[in-house]
């Protein structure tokens, strides 16, 4: 706290500000400081408020030892000066007897007699105050359930009583009753009791997160697997990193351990490492540690005891080491509770959890399903391939010669040989063979550098690839191999050309590179056929890449000319790999030239050749291209078949014959065209994981971003959030080492998912942070405009209209630098509706100012469109949305409609209706109707027109009391829509007309 409050007004302001903070040490320390400040004032009432805030901070900050001490001070004040406590303060005081009971129960050092004495005091106080005793019996039952003695009687004494205003909330009592049935072994009855909470009908600060954590295993045991999965995702988010809900986190870890999700369990454990240090409640700590031990025990039993695990701060842990530590601490805590209670109940329940067998072998909890092998420090081993790779020779000379022979063919097994040789050469005791056939060590080092350069190129590290190829060329020169040197320099040219940015620059670089390549080729003599074919292929590739960037008709013929040279030469010398490679490039060139049928014909001929003559390892890549051509020809099913076959065949080959992640992404695209988005989502996440295993992290995170957006589009909000939470927790992302824009995109999608999941507070905080960061993106003001606009809408939904206006102004300023007409106009209209809806007439001027801004942006869009500078798609926000207000809700549809002018007119109508300016509203809505015109039988905006008519009828008939013209309008619209076959759209109009007639 910067400065202590100097008067009681400042104290109350500080207490209110602290109340808005999340529970934790910051809030608790501030509450302690405010109590110190309150003690300086002569008035005792501010001290009461400060003590109440401090007790709340201790209670929900998991510091049960301190809560009773604070309450004792409050009780003394009440006994000494009861008149200081108004009705609200008195209510809070008697409510918190239960908090103290709960706090004392969590402390094994408090004797059982002390707990019973407190319950007696609570009963006597309640009786003296004339309060019902149901809350007292509720606390007595909780103590009985904790000790395991006389539980049935205590339950009946509590559950049979009528609730009072001091009873715990419905959600908490539901959880308590359900847990009673759960302890008795009746899963079905427990779940039936829980249903209102699990369905979201009853909730509080701790619910449904607490109930969800207990219900997960019963749901599995009763076969409700999918619901358990969904509730795990939503429920975990409600308790993670929260010291007062450490037990709930422990049960989620246990759920992961018993469903084959041990890797996710370790990930969640790392996310909650703070709970080892921040949980001051022994009972909560025991609950958490037992869940941790269930997880670690399972991981260790699967043979992964040496995996790293996140544990108590101050040292590094393995799974086995942490399990031993956790077991010791948890056993000690359980023993202390049982000693206090005089029973073995706590230890017995702990043992029952540890003895549970897995309930499912493998439940796919999240879109990012990972195994323990995936989280191991060492690179995961590749899955066994159906095709058996040729054995790597044992003799060093044979191995070197074999690698070169395979490399000459372009065989995928080459990589395994080079990898083995790289390890051998790096050994301190390496001795190079004295074999003329093998050649000198410098030649082998050149070979290895060439392979390393190829790997860099596969990871799109073109600068590194170019440098390594040049270095390899120099070594080949030293070894007396000018042909190899020429190929390396040619490949370096290609890598350098990849580094150019922008289509024009890239085309120029590729043209120059081709000239240099031809000169290099012509100046190198004595080339063996396979090397000459490689140089010819490089020449054709450079021109093919130029065509890809320019799509210029004049660049088509030169590519085919080079390909003709390659095909003639490779056919004459029977260089099979370059024949098929050239034919593949020929098909690609036809596609780039816009002749997809010709491209498909070329591919079909090539596939026939490959199946009869080989090389077989070219089949996956060729099928992949064929699939992409089929997509271009609108045959998604044929494309899917080709991609699936390519993926199957690619698994038969080692190395990087074809990029499996690209094929998986292609499969996802085909699935989207086939209307199978859930399958597409699975392929996208597999593609991302494949890229991660290949250490292509940027590609992986881009694909994860696409998967997250798709899951959000599909309404799988919790899946989206869980996926992004996992990705954002990756070490390089968390450390800020990933590209900041890509990280921002991941966070932006997560913020949108939080909003869709109705976690408005978290979504607003993330959007505000992103808006602040993106304000510094001088090279990308358009993105800042979009983010700031979305932030403004969220702030408006939260009622923070001053901050919303600031964010909207930022968006408008950024929009001037990089126009985002559609997005910004949409946000401004939504803000107008929000402010008018929430503030009524008081908010009308500010709301109309937003619409004026939206109108100016619409004018800009129209001018830009007419000038050919931008194509701005108009949209109509008219939405047939149910809401409490007669004139609809503030939601703005993104459905495209007839005109932006119509959209603005409609919004003016809604905003003025919210602001009770009904004449202006009616005029605007009639204008919107006129601009829309009556829909025809095929128009898909009939529903929007009907909603506009309905709102006009509401304003005219209900608010302005002009029933007759309103009925005329409504009846005419119903007749028109019925005649067109739009019966569904007539229902709200007919309902409004009936209401108006009833009120006549």
Question: What is each of the regions a protein language model found here?
Answer:
Residues 2, 276-423, 430, 464, ...:
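C-terminal non-catalytic interaction modules
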């Amino acid at each position: 706290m910067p400065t202590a409050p100097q008067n009681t007004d400042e104290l109350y302001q500080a207490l209110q500000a602290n109340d808005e903070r999340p529970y934790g040490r910051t809030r608790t320390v501030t509450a302690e400081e405010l109590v110190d400040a309150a003690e300086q004032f002569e008035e005792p009432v501010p001290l009461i408020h400060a003590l109440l805030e401090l007790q709340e901070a201790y209670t929900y900050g998991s510091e049960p030892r301190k809560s009773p001490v604070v309450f004792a001070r409050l009780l003394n004040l009440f006994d000494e000066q009861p008149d200081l406590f108004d009705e609200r303060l008195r209510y809070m005081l008697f409510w918190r007897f239960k908090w103290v009971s709960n706090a004392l129960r969590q402390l094994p050092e408090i004797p059982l007699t002390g707990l019973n004495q407190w319950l007696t005091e609570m009963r006597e106080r309640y009786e003296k105050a004339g309060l019902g005793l149901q809350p007292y019996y509720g606390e007595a039952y909780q103590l009985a359930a904790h000790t395991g003695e006389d539980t049935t009687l205590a339950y009946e004494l509590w559950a049979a009583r009528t609730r009072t205003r001091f009873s715990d909330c419905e959600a908490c009592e539901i959880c308590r009753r359900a847990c009673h049935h759960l302890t008795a072994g009746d899963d079905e009855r427990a779940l039936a009791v829980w249903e209102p909470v699990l369905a979201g009908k009853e909730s509080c600060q701790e619910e449904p997160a607490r109930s969800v954590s207990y219900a997960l295993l019963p749901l599995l045991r009763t076969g409700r697997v999918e619901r358990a999965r969904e509730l795990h995702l939503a429920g975990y988010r409600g308790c993670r990193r929260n010291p007062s809900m450490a037990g709930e986190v422990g049960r989620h870890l246990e759920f992961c351990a018993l469903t084959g999700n041990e890797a996710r369990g370790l990930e969640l454990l790392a996310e909650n490492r703070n709970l080892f240090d921040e949980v001051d409640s022994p009972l909560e700590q025991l609950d958490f540690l037992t869940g941790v031990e269930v997880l670690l025990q399972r991981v260790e039993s699967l043979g992964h005891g040496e995996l790293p695990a996140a544990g108590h701060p101050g040292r590094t842990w393995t799974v086995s080491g942490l399990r031993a530590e956790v077991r010791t601490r948890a056993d000690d805590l359980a023993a202390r509770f049982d000693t206090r209670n005089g029973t073995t109940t706590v230890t017995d329940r702990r043992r029952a959890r540890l003895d549970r067998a897995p309930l499912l072998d493998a439940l796919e909890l999240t879109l990012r399903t990972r195994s323990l092998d995936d989280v191991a420090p060492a690179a995961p081993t590749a899955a066994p391939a159906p095709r058996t790779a040729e054995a790597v020779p044992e003799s060093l000379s044979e191995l070197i010669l074999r690698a070169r022979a395979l490399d000459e063919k372009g065989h995928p097994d080459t990589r395994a040989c080079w990898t083995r040789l790289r390890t051998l050469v790096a050994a301190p005791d390496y001795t190079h063979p004295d074999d003329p056939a093998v050649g000198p060590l410098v030649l082998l080092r050149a070979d290895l550098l060439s392979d390393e350069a190829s790997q860099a190129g596969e990871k799109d590290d073109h600068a590194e690839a170019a440098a390594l190829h040049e270095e390899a060329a120099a070594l080949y020169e030293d070894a007396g191999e000018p042909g190899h040197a020429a190929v390396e320099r040619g490949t370096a040219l290609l890598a350098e050309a990849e580094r150019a940015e922008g289509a024009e620059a890239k085309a120029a670089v590729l043209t120059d590179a081709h000239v240099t390549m031809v000169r290099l080729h012509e100046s190198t003599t004595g080339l063996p056929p396979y090397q000459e074919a490689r140089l010819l292929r490089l020449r054709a590739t450079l021109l093919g890449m130029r065509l890809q960037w320019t799509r210029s008709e004049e660049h088509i013929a030169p590519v085919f000319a080079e390909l003709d040279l390659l095909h003639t030469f490779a056919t004459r010398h029977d260089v099979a790999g370059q024949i098929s490679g050239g034919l593949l490039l020929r098909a690609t060139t036809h596609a780039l030239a816009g002749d997809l049928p010709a491209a498909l014909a070329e591919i079909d001929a090539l596939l026939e050749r490959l199946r009869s003559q080989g090389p077989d390892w070219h089949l996956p890549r060729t099928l992949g291209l064929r699939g992409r051509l089929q997509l271009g020809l609108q045959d998604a099913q044929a494309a899917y078949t080709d991609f699936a076959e390519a993926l199957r065949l690619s698994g038969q080959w080692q190395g990087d014959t074809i990029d499996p992640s690209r094929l998986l992404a292609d499969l996802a695209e085909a699935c989207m065209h086939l209307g199978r988005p859930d399958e597409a989502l699975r392929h996208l996440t597999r593609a991302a994981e494949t890229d991660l295993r290949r250490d292509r992290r940027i590609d992986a995170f881009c694909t994860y971003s696409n998967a997250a957006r798709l899951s959000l589009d599909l309404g799988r909000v919790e899946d989206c959030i869980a996926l992004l939470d996992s990705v954002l927790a990756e070490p390089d992302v968390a450390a800020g080492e990933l590209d900041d824009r890509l990280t921002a995109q991941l966070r932006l999608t997560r913020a949108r998912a939080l909003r869709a999941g109705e976690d408005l507070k978290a979504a607003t905080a993330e959007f505000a942070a992103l808006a602040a960061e993106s304000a510094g993106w001088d090279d990308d003001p358009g993105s800042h405009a979009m983010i700031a606009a979305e932030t403004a809408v969220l702030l408006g939904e939260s009622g923070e209209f001053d901050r919303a206006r600031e964010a909207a102004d930022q968006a408008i300023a950024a929009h001037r630098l990089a126009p985002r007409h559609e997005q910004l106009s949409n946000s401004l209209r939504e803000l107008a509706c929000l402010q008018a809806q929430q503030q009524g007439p008081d908010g009308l001027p500010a709301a109309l100012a937003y619409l004026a801004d939206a109108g100016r942006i619409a004018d800009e869009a129209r001018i830009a469109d007419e000038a050919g500078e931008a194509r701005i798609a108009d949209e109509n926000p008219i939405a047939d949305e149910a809401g409490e207000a007669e004139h609809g809700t503030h939601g703005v549809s993104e459905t495209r409609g007839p005109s932006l002018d119509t959209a603005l007119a409609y919004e003016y109508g809604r905003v003025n209706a919210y602001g009770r300016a009904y004449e202006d509203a009616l005029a605007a809505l009639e204008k919107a109707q006129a601009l829309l015109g009556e829909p025809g039988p095929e128009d898909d905006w009939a529903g929007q027109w009907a909603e506009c008519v309905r709102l006009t009828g509401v304003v005219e008939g209900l608010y302005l009391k002009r029933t007759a013209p309103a009925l005329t309008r409504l009846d005419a619209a119903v007749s028109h829509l019925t005649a067109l076959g739009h019966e569904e759209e007539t229902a709200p109009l007919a309902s409004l007309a009936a209401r108006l007639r009833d009120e006549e």
